[in-house]
Amino acid sequence: DRDATILKDDRTDNGDGNFHYSFETSNGIQDTKTGVPGSAGQSNMNGDFSFPLDDGSTASFTYVADENGYHVESPLLPSIPEYVQKQIDFAAEQRARGVIFD
């Protein structure tokens, strides 16, 4: 949307790896993000974003990004198939027993 305007643009950066960012546009796009320094040198972030879809509904997502990767949730995303969840659970059990994956 070329005519969209920024309604809100808030940014705070403490200079030490801690930050907060939030914006909203006139066409319904929203994004909020908070970050803190991570234990392995990365920046840990969590936030949410949303945008309007052509049918008038809104696509909404929440996420965490940290030393364990990027994890996003949304009603629009499919569920993990049962066989995949079983593999994830099995790997977690093995890690708990001390198995190391290279």
UniProtKB/Swiss-Prot annotation:
Q: Does the keyword Transport apply?
A: no
**Any one GO molecular function term:** structural constituent of cuticle
Give me the stretches of Polar residues compositional bias.
23-33
Q: Which intervals of the chain are annotated as region Disordered? A: 23-50
Q: Which PROSITE patterns match?
A: CHIT_BIND_RR_1, CHIT_BIND_RR_2
The tissues where this chain's protein is expressed are given as: Arthrodial membrane and calcified shell.
InterPro entries given in the database record: CHIT_BIND_RR_consensus, Insect_cuticle
Answer whether the UniProt record assigns the keyword Metal-binding to this protein.
no
Domain (Chitin-binding type R&R): give its ranges.
16-81
Keywords in alphabetical order, please.
Answer: Cuticle
Show the Pfam families listed in the entry.
Chitin_bind_4 (PF00379)
Q: What is this protein called?
A: Cuticle protein AM/CP1114
The major lineage groups are: Eukaryota, Metazoa, Ecdysozoa, Arthropoda, Crustacea
